[in-house]
Amino acid sequence: DLHKHSSSSPLYLAGLEFQEEGFEAYSDGDIVLHALCDALLGSVSKKDLGYYFPSKEPTEKGVRSTQMLEKILEIIEYDKLRVCNIDITIITQRFFVSERREELEENISKLLNIDIGKINIKGKTTDSFGLIGDKQASACLVTILLENA
């Protein structure tokens, strides 16, 4: 997931709010939860997040990504699955992921009701190249391994 930065909204990451510049988005713009939702959907061969939360729907404007995640967990029948591991890469030059890693991992652990040891979050930069390097945007990639419970 990738979003352009915006000074008109707070920063949401992994369901947590930080008092700094957030993202331009129809929802709260939480790149971590958006990428996690897409990874969950993809792991069970479902359509992408935009299919379930179309940005053209007025009812979805400003929706919290934690609410999106709850719906996605129902759609994929999460209670019948077990998370083996989640690997999250946040690509940004706006902040240091290492300064927030523990609280982000803790919140994802709570949201998914899994052991924190199954979650890995790392930060990467683009060495000042492109939109992310120019601090205009940030992105997140998520890989998840699930098995039947």
What are these regions, as identified by a protein language model?
Residues 132-149:
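C-terminal edge-of-domain segments
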Residues 75, 107, 111, 145:
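Mid-sequence acidic-hydrophobic segments that form the walls
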Residues 2-101, 112:
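RNase III-family endoribonuclease catalytic core
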Residues 87-96, 101-132:
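Short, conserved loop-to-beta-strand elements that form functional interface hotspots
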Residues 4, 15, 123, 144-146:
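Short, structured patches in soluble enzyme cores that scaffold and shape functional sites
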Residues 39-40, 113-118, 147-149:
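Short, surface-exposed, polar/charged, turn-prone segments marking secondary-structure boundaries
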